[in-house]
A protein has these predicted regions:
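Cationic, low-complexity basic patches in intrinsically disordered or flexible, solvent-exposed regions
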Residues: 3
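Binding-site signature for planar aromatic cofactors or substrates
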Residues: 11-240
């Protein structure tokens, strides 16, 4: 089940999706590049458990964190928090440029799905890289505001329980976290979903993956269908 989407007023959001010919920091063949920012944001919202990456003394440092994607004032903002014991918040405060990686379903693709024997295995997946500047905060009012975003997104039913907790307990718990907000300056979206294969081969892949009991694998088939791949999508397009 996808987390509930929360929307905010603020007018049209600036398109920060990296387009053809622009500088990029991840290898994306043109077959697999997305130039649809709306679809990219939807993918991020459906897969909000991201990897936050920044540097300390030229060494990479990563944390695995759920985040909320917010569109406000024409900008995309990513909000979340880390444990105060996690030094990552200090690294963000010292050097604000950072990267958040959103990864969705993925699956091994057997060459048995293809129409000729001269083929090799590959892997299908979707991923989005979000680059931006981070700001950290630990003031109670702003932490509460951040949780007002997180709780409705991931478990709206918990809001009442959270509000009913003893205030001293809530304050003590908030003292163990540091919040962050990242204003996104650039998005790079890669959906490697057999776009370089024939429609029939795409359909073979979809049907093969759909038979799996592993939701990560079958989810890859669903992602391919969302991107209008396969013979069924082609037929639907012709019928419209």
């Amino acid at each position: 089940m996808q987390p509930a989407r929360k929307t905010w007023a603020g007018g049209q959001t600036t398109n920060v999706l990296t387009r053809r010919g622009r500088k990029k920091s991840v290898y994306i063949p043109e077959h697999f590049r997305s130039e649809d920012q709306g679809a990219t944001l939807a993918f991020m919202r459906a897969n909000p458990f991201a990897i936050l990456v920044s540097t300390k003394d030229s060494e990479p440092f990563a944390s695995h964190i759920p985040v909320v994607i917010r569109e406000q004032g024409g900008r995309i903002k990513l909000r979340g928090h880390v444990a105060k014991a996690n030094p990552h918040w200090r690294y963000l405060a010292e050097q604000s440029p950072c990267l958040l990686i959103f990864h969705g379903p993925h699956a091994y693709i057997s060459p048995s799905n293809y129409e000729t024997r001269e083929n090799v295995p590959t892997w299908n997946y979707g991923a989005v890289h979000a680059y931006g500047e981070a700001r950290t905060f630990s003031e109670i009012p702003e932490l509460l505001n951040m949780l007002d975003d997180l709780i409705p997104t991931f478990e709206a039913a918990y809001a009442q329980q959270w509000s009913a907790l003893n205030e001293s307990y809530r304050t003590r718990m908030l003292g163990h976290i540091v919040g962050f907000e990242i204003v996104v300056s650039r998005l790079e979206a890669k959906f490697k979903l057999s776009q370089n294969r024939t429609r029939q081969e795409q359909q073979n892949v979809i049907e093969s993956l759909s038979r799996s009991s592993d939701t990560t694998v079958s989810g890859t088939a669903e992602l391919m269908c969302e991107h209008a791949l396969g013979t069924k999508a082609q037929k639907k397009s012709k019928d419209q």
